[in-house]
A protein has these predicted regions:
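C-terminal subdomain of alpha/beta-hydrolase-fold enzymes, centered on the catalytic histidine
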Residues: 284-424
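Conserved hydrolase catalytic core segment
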Residues: 156, 160-163, 211-259
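C-terminal motif of bacterial Sec signal peptides marking the signal peptidase cleavage site
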Residues: 24-27
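Conserved alpha/beta-hydrolase
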Residues: 157-183
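Glycine-rich "HGGG/HGxG" loop immediately N-terminal to the catalytic nucleophile
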Residues: 100-102, 165, 178-192, 226
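Conserved acidic catalytic loop of the alpha/beta-hydrolase fold
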Residues: 195-213
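Short beta-strand element of the alpha/beta-hydrolase
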Residues: 134-142
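Non-catalytic accessory segments flanking enzyme active sites
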Residues: 57-129, 328, 337, 343-358
Length: 424
């Protein structure tokens, strides 16, 4: 992989950037011990265990057994959407072999909590490192992902020595479920845009007693991280993103002047590829409720909608299971099913279009690290990144796509260690 770093004091911005195409742009370390209030009050932090009722799982299996798949033109693959043969195989595995209880037990091996913020119960994992001086790190997922994307990197981040790393690179890890996702409550009012979600996460970290912390994310997690860095700059040690946002520099007659040809070609290639993968944006950004009636009622439909994105946004040669196992895919999909959150999670696209931020996020002064994966859904040239962020760390990855933590955990963990090492 290519890797470049510059001292922060030089304020030198070096970056390759991933462009957010969702249209929602309108949209050093101090480590305090967490203070978890044990009394019954509005700020109480409560332990939480995942325990899906048996009847929910029985109903899921009954629905899977009654699946009615549509026809498919013979000889077609994934260009019309989710491939029927693969979906049928996935459904059979889901019904006959996938063990949610086994996955539930693994997930419950981590410390889960809930706390009320902004009128919502917010679910999160909180794993503290035993290493003195560990940096608190907020990991934020996007759509159609969830907190489960990050569970395989908790160990390497909190206990690097156990995974062949340097204990000095340790982190305390906080992984929330965004409002409307997973085991967090669903907002019951309009306007829950990325800004509002960033406020919730800032309140969560404050409640845990972390005065300063790092943030990492992709997809909506990157968007929310940018808002955090803009509105809570004094709290962030550093911002790491595998989905860096950035538009053309303002006031420049020719925004492509001086941009390397290779970057322009890569941006065009990514834009062409994503043009065939972006129908969901319009649906979820305009009529998420209508879509939800189908996806919340049919597990096969839900699986088809989600697995299409994992297939289209990841780095593989046609074999999806060369990068994700069926269990990984189905744990995430089942989480959406048992919590009935596919509709509430999709509404962020609608809200980001219709609820403008109340605070303008300008240039990000917080030191920013970028991990550029070759099969990310879009790409932004260097000059655009320089106009948006104080990027002090840039890594061009040899492989990987949109779901970096799940697809290439070792690469992401290594880059997080490298980036934050210069900020300790």
């Amino acid at each position: 992989m290519e890797k470049y770093s510059k001292p922060i004091r030089n304020r030198i911005v070096i970056s390759a950037v991933v462009l957010i195409v969702f249209g929602m742009l309108t949209a050093c370390t101090t480590d305090s011990q967490p203070e978890e209030n044990s009394t019954m009050n509005a700020e109480e932090i409560r332990s939480f265990d995942i325990s899906v009722p048996d009847e929910v799982l029985t109903d899921l299996n009954d629905r899977l057994a009654l699946t009615r798949l549509p026809d498919q033109i013979p000889g077609t693959g994934w260009d019309y959407g989710t491939n029927r043969e693969y979906l049928q195989e996935l459904i059979e595995y889901w019904k006959d072999e996938f063990d949610w209880r086994d996955q539930e037990e693994k997930l419950n091996g981590f410390n889960h909590f809930k706390t009320a913020i902004d009128g919502l119960d917010v679910h999160f994992i909180h794993e503290r490192s035993s290493v003195d001086g560990a940096i608190p790190l907020l990991l934020t997922h996007g759509w159609p992902g969830s907190f489960v994307e990050f569970v395989d990197i908790i160990g390497p981040l909190t206990d690097p020595e156990a995974y062949g790393g340097d204990p000095a690179d340790a982190f305390h890890v906080v992984i929330p479920s965004l409002p409307g996702y997973g085991f967090s409550d669903k907002p019951e009012e309009r306007g829950y845009n990325p800004e509002r979600m960033a406020d919730v996460l800032a309140s969560l970290m404050e409640r845990l007693g972390y005065e300063r912390y790092g943030a990492q994310g992709g997809d909506w997690g990157a968007i929310i991280g940018r808002v955090l860095a803009g509105n809570y700059a004094d709290r962030l040690i550093g911002l790491h993103s595998n989905f860096v946002l950035g538009g053309p520099p303002r006031g420049v007659a020719d925004p492509e002047a001086g941009v390397p040809v290779a970057e322009l070609e890569f941006r065009q290639e990514r834009a062409r590829a994503f043009a065939n993968e972006s129908a969901y944006q319009t649906l979820q950004g305009t009529k998420p409720q209508s879509l939800g009636y189908g996806l919340n009622d049919s597990p096969a439909g839900l699986a088809a909608w989600i697995v299409e994105k994992f297939h289209g946004w990841s780095d593989h040669d046609g074999d999806l299971e060369s990068v994700f196992t069926k269990d990984q895919l189905l744990t995430n999909i089942t989480l959406y099913w048992v919590t009935e959150t596919i509709t509430s999670a999709s509404r962020i696209y609608y809200e980001s279009r219709r609820t403008p931020p109340t605070r303008r996020v300008g240039f990000i002064e917080v030191p920013t690290g970028a991990a550029i994966f070759p099969k990310e859904i879009s790409f932004t040239p260097l000059k655009c990144a320089e106009a948006q962020y104080n990027i002090v760390h840039w890594t061009v990855m040899p492989r990987g796509g949109h779901f970096a933590a799940l697809e290439q955990p070792e690469l992401l963990v290594g880059d997080l260690r490298d980036f934050f090492r210069g900020l300790r």
